[in-house]
């Protein structure tokens, strides 16, 4: 049976959208939900947090989830410091139990929903009889394409099989970057006609504010990231020490984490508010993100929104966001010598910093705003719902 026309015909009861999420997703869930509401103003959007609404309210489900996670990933939890919260979403138990609970909860009201929509590909929120859409920044197997990614850090094939079900049950999949779209096709066999790259926007207020960086002469570098190792923090410290040998007044500000043993010229502030991130960006001369794994990198979009140049790794989504030699510099991951040279090239050239920052700002204003993302998602949903399922 084909899906209903979009928008619903007069008299149709399909006037709701179910929006499924897991936690905050670095504030992306808030921005995405705002766009779903803005782009579908005639629809009531019901938000549903699978963790808070399904797991935390059911002590037995939570206890069994922990037990299954420890049984499946016990050694990795202990030796690789794999976070329990991350591993629990990669167990067959929680995957199937969440899908059962979602279907049971919504079964009596299936007729009320025009479509369902989920962010991230960690669970399957599809409901039989309702068109389903996914918006994600990653696939798990995309990790295997990063240089030097340890094979023993990949989740087992049992999880990949479940992840593949998420994509099979979606009418259309929206992704933040082309490298994820490529992975969907090459690693999961998803036809390109069922995927769209829609990018993402900034998760902090980007209202224009004057920069306080002495015309890019204060030589302040900002790093933003919660996962110090994954974001290339140790490589950045090694590069920064090399940089300081030539540029002794260079300064490194670390936001999001608080590593120990920092050399002179470095300061770490740990987790800070979005407003504090904005203030630090306004005081910086550039952003550096020498990440080892990067599904998207919203921090780069936020830096460009503040007219800052960037130095980032040439992996994942980065080459699609940063134009080499125009808005920033791309370097290989885990290469402190190349990173130090790139930092030196920009931090000692205020005019180039300003020129790159303006180019990055123009690029994100055109392609990386939440309004642009919402418009692309709406267009994709409209086109999909006008096409019979399976056509």
What are the language-model segments listed below?
Residues 152-173:
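Membrane-proximal helix-turn-helix segments that form the acceptor-binding/catalytic region
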Residues 174, 205, 210-231, 237-241:
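Conserved donor-binding/catalytic core segment of Leloir-type glycosyltransferases
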Residues 179, 201:
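Carbohydrate-associated surface elements
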Residues 271, 324-325, 329-336, 345-350:
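Conserved acidic donor-binding segment of nucleotide-sugar-dependent glycosyltransferases
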Residues 272, 279-284:
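Short alpha-helical donor nucleotide-sugar binding micro-motif in glycosyltransferases
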Residues 287-288:
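A short hydrophobic beta-strand element within the catalytic core of glycosyltransferases
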Residues 292:
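Aromatic "clamp/platform" in nucleotide-sugar-dependent glycosyltransferases that forms part
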Residues 309-312, 322:
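Short hydrophobic beta-strand element within catalytic cores of glycosyltransferases
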């Amino acid at each position: 049976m084909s899906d209903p026309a979009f928008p619903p015909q007069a008299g149709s009861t399909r006037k709701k959208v179910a929006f499924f999420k897991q936690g905050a997703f670095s504030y992306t869930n808030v921005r995405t939900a705002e766009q779903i509401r803005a782009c579908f103003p005639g629809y009531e959007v019901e938000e549903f947090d699978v963790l808070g609404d399904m797991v935390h309210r059911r002590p037995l489900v939570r206890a069994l989830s922990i037990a299954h996670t420890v049984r499946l990933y016990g050694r990795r939890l202990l030796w690789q410091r794999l976070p329990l919260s991350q591993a629990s979403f990669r167990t067959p138990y929680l995957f199937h139990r969440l899908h059962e609970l979602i279907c049971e909860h919504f079964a009596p009201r299936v007729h009320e929903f025009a479509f369902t929509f989920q962010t991230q590909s960690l669970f399957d929120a599809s409901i039989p009889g309702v068109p389903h859409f996914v918006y994600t920044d990653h696939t798990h197997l995309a990790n295997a394409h990063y240089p030097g990614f340890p094979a023993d850090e990949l989740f087992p094939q049992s999880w990949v099989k479940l992840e593949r079900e998420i994509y099979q049950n979606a009418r259309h999949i929206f992704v933040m970057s082309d490298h994820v779209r490529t992975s969907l096709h090459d690693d999961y066999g998803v036809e390109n006609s069922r995927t769209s790259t829609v990018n993402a926007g900034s998760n902090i207020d980007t209202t224009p504010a004057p920069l306080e960086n002495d015309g890019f002469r204060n030589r302040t570098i900002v790093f933003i990231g919660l996962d110090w190792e994954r974001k290339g923090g140790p490589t950045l410290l090694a590069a920064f020490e090399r940089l300081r040998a030539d540029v002794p007044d260079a300064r490194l500000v670390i936001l999001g984490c608080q590593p120990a043993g920092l050399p002179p010229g470095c300061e770490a502030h740990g987790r800070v508010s979005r407003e504090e991130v904005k203030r630090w960006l306004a005081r910086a001369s550039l952003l550096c993100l020498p990440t080892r794994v990067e599904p998207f990198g919203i921090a780069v979009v936020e830096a460009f929104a503040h007219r800052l140049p960037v130095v980032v790794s040439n992996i994942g989504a980065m080459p699609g966001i940063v134009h080499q030699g125009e808005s920033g510099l791309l370097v290989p991951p885990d290469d402190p010598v190349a990173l130090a040279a790139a930092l030196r090239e920009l931090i000692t050239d205020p005019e180039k910093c300003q020129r790159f920052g303006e180019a990055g700002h123009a690029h994100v204003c055109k392609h990386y705003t939440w309004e642009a993302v919402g418009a692309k998602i709406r267009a994709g949903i409209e086109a999909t719902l006008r096409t019979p399922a399976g056509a």
